[in-house]
């Protein structure tokens, strides 16, 4: 069984026991989170497509850890002015393991 969930402004195709990295969630490591915005749920070619979400379908996942992504450097240089600016950013991520998919 698979599902397509929407979280953090992105869509992910998930199945049971999948481990994926998503945008940061406000949950402790080891906590169980529940995703209710399910776009598609089904087995193989037999899938239920939501409009926009499948009513009553949920996906449960366990929070494995919180981490940060690679550093992205924003570098600005102004020509002929001996002026430059370098700024770094690291995005926060949450690693989750899908435990259960409940279809309506």
Swiss-Prot record:
Name of the protein: Large ribosomal subunit protein bL21
SUPFAM superfamilies, sorted: L21p-like
Function: This protein binds to 23S rRNA in the presence of protein L20.
HAMAP family referenced in this protein's UniProt entry, alphabetically: Ribosomal_bL21
Originating species: Allorhizobium ampelinum (strain ATCC BAA-846 / DSM 112012 / S4)
Subunit note: Part of the 50S ribosomal subunit. Contacts protein L20.
A GO-annotated cellular component: ribosome
Pfam families reported for this sequence: Ribosomal_L21p
Family: Belongs to the bacterial ribosomal protein bL21 family.
InterPro entries: bL21-like, bL21-like_sf, Ribosomal_bL21
Assigned keywords, A-Z: Ribonucleoprotein, Ribosomal protein, RNA-binding, rRNA-binding
Listed GO biological process terms: translation
Single GO MF descriptor: rRNA binding
């Amino acid at each position: 069984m698979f599902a397509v969930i929407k979280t953090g402004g992105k869509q992910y195709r998930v199945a049971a026991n999948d481990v994926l990295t998503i945008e940061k969630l406000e949950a402790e490591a080891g906590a169980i989170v529940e995703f209710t915005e399910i776009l598609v749920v089904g087995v193989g070619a037999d899938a239920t497509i939501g409009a926009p979400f499948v009513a009553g379908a949920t996906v449960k996942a366990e929070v494995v850890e919180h981490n940060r992504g690679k550093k992205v450097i924003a570098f600005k240089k102004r020509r002929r002015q001996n002026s430059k600016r370098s700024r770094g950013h690291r995005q926060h991520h949450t690693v989750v393991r899908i435990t259960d998919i409940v279809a309506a």
